[in-house]
Amino acid sequence: MHRKFATAIGVGAGALLALSACSSSSSTTSTAPATSAAASASATASASAAATASSGGASSIVGSSSFNDAALQQLTTKIQGAIGSKSLSGVKIAFVTNGNSAYWNEAKAGWNAAMKWLSGKGASGTFQEPTASEASVQVSLLETDSAQGYTGWGVSAVTASSLTTPIAQAVAKGLSVVAYDSPLPGTAAQLYIGTPNTTAGCDAGKAMTQAIGSGEVVAISGSWTAANTQQRVAGFEQCAGSGIKVVQKINDNQDVATAVSDLQASLQANSSIKGIYAVYSYDGGAAGQAVTSANDIGKVTIVSDDGEQNTINDVKSGVIAASILQRPYYQGFMTAYVLAADKALGDSATMALVKPYFVAGPGNTLSTGVGIMTKANESDFASFWSGIGISAQ
């Protein structure tokens, strides 16, 4: 489900088509773009059409674009009300990614939208994208930010274990820490803001089952030690059923070229492969390229995670059957609000506001929801991205 790094593939395996996005009005207040009635109607129609489609094949996968936007906007309103007329001049917060990737553009849009309201009340914040996806870089940033008077720190950990002690030390000094994108259970992080990864993996498993029924599947990810990968694949295997067997787990070490070549080798070595579950954000495009070069379009079904441009292109062309999407916008948006509230209101008051919105999951999970992009409902996602000024995740 993850995003990440390395080189871009250039173009998707399918034809590069221009995204058709509906225009949406922007607001001067710190709110997320509202889902239009047309988009909602389109999502309903897409789901209805898919539900009535004949069993088997990509057309049988039911898409969804609802996420958890309404609940998170309700929570935002409550936080704003609780802050009220309080000054946020003592708030200094950071959003630290796990590397430099186009995936974070959507999260940055959400962070910036939240900071418009928060900075108007005196808060300051920085969006920090390390050029290297290394645990040591994140540890160094945490130590530096803590020493420079930051009051709150949001992080997508490269390696959870490497941050356990540094987070504990920072929290002991008064820093608030929130995990997003990948949970940090067992650490001093207060909560996790993001997709319930097991649920997202379950949706991927269901989609694969709807498309192929049964058969051998390859799973590929950039890291098999990352909590989000482990949870996604566990959810996939739980919900795919006994008829689908993951026969190979490929580690591409967050390198696109490696992902493509390893998948090509896997397809060449095993003609029985019927599906690929592509976990990291670039893996969908890599899988599309591998399947296309093997002339296996229609024979090998791809279910991917996230919505990088290459993935979108391949969903639109039918090379990828479905992609399971997160809502990075709200990872950035809610991280800013929760960290600011924790400083302004205190931990107990902030958690009292947030706790009713937790869902089942590790580390106090504030869910940003799960979306399922198919060829039938891709325009719903394009409309949202257009409204926040980007073309893809």
State each model region's role.
Residues 1-20:
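Sec-dependent bacterial lipoprotein signal peptides
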Residues 135-150, 259-272:
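Short, well-structured alpha-helical segments in soluble
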Residues 155-172, 236, 253-314:
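Hydrophobic alpha-helical
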Residues 93, 97-101, 111, 202-249, ...:
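An alpha-beta-alpha
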